[in-house]
Amino acid sequence: MHASASQDKNRRKPGHDEGAHNPDYENITLAFRNKDQLKLSQSTPTKQAKFKTSLDPAESPPWLYRTIMMLYVLLALVFLSCIVLSALVLVKNSEMSKELWTLKAELSNVSDTVWNIRELQNQQTRIWEAAQGDIKEVKKTLGTVMSSIQTGNDRLKTVPADITQIKKTLEALEKKAQPQPST
């Protein structure tokens, strides 16, 4: 609103009594040496006001095009960096996928090894239990054999007495079987 009032002041002829009815208006007159300076001073704010309010592309400043081009270049660089980062992410993802497959294979091998170890432990437990049963059986058999040997030893102890008894019986029989001399 203030800018439009200053434009109106510049367009009107000097000496127009607009401020007579307005208490905020100050009538300021400037002394210029020639009329060219007056025209330049009056035309400069008008051009500035037109430049600020104008949206015409023909009147846009040259730095605006450079700035827009820089923004496009920055946008292209950001886009390229996104592509590069995406490619890096894909490469890393591929590497991690390979590592995961390797780890999965190693884990499978470890789990197979653990399963084999458990099976071997179960088999070893079964063999140990069978060996313990066989040892108990052998101990029982040894007990029976020892008892039989002891019984045999006890019988052998009586054999010499039996042999002497048999010898005495044989001698007695021999005596009876010999003819007696007649007298």
UniProtKB/Swiss-Prot annotation:
GO terms for cellular component: cell surface; membrane; protein-containing complex. It is found in: Membrane. It comes from Mus musculus (Mouse). Residues 1-70 are cytoplasmic. InterPro entries: MCEMP1. The chain crosses the membrane at residues 71-91. This is Mast cell-expressed membrane protein 1. PANTHER family: MAST CELL-EXPRESSED MEMBRANE PROTEIN 1 (PTHR37856:SF1). Glycans are attached at residue 109. Its main location: membrane. GO terms for biological process: inflammatory response; Kit signaling pathway; mast cell proliferation. Residues 92-183 are extracellular. Residues 15-24 have a biased composition (Basic and acidic residues). Keywords: Glycoprotein, Membrane, Signal-anchor, Transmembrane, Transmembrane helix. Signal peptide: none annotated. Residues 1-26 are annotated as: Disordered. It is a single-pass type II membrane protein.
